[in-house]
């Protein structure tokens, strides 16, 4: 419990449970012998990378920040966990100003504005659909990441 409410003020059990549900932490908590009271090793080494990521999202959700800064939120997770992380991010970022650094474009395709950086400079900006239509660097990166999934060029 302490690990999720860390830094949150007066977090109720209902808020804790709601955060665990929308960030997909509930199955993890249910598997743990002591549930929310399960001891967490230093740096969370007793959890997988994906589990640590989802726990950090639950923690952020109960703190109710106005601004989120996310750096490679889906890095180092398997495909199944990435889907859970993406869904959790959707809930976490709703109604908040979010600055997201990402190489996996699936993490940012639904945001209001994307800034594409190349060699330290912003070279493109726009929404996902706009950037695909421009057929620039973002489009090329998207092709590299997703064309193989459909067996053809995307967009």
Enumerate the predicted regions with their spans.
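C-terminal boundary and immediately downstream tail of ABC-type ATPase nucleotide-binding domains
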Residues: 133-155
């Amino acid at each position: 419990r302490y690990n999720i409410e860390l830094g949150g003020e007066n977090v109720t059990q209902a808020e804790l449970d709601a955060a665990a549900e929308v960030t997909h932490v509930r199955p993890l908590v249910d598997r743990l012998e002591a549930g929310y009271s399960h001891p967490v090793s230093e740096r969370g080494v007793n959890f997988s990378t994906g589990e640590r990521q989802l726990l950090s999202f639950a923690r952020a959700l109960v703190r109710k920040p106005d601004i989120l800064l996310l750096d490679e939120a889906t890095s180092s997770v398997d495909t199944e966990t990435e889907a859970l992380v993406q869904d959790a991010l959707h809930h976490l970022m709703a109604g908040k100003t979010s600055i997201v650094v990402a190489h996996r474009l699936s993490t940012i395709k639904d945001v209001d504005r994307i800034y594409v950086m190349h060699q330290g400079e912003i070279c493109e900006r726009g929404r996902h659909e706009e950037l695909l239509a421009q057929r620039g660097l973002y489009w090329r990166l998207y092709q590299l990441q997703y064309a193989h999934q459909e067996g053809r060029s995307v967009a």
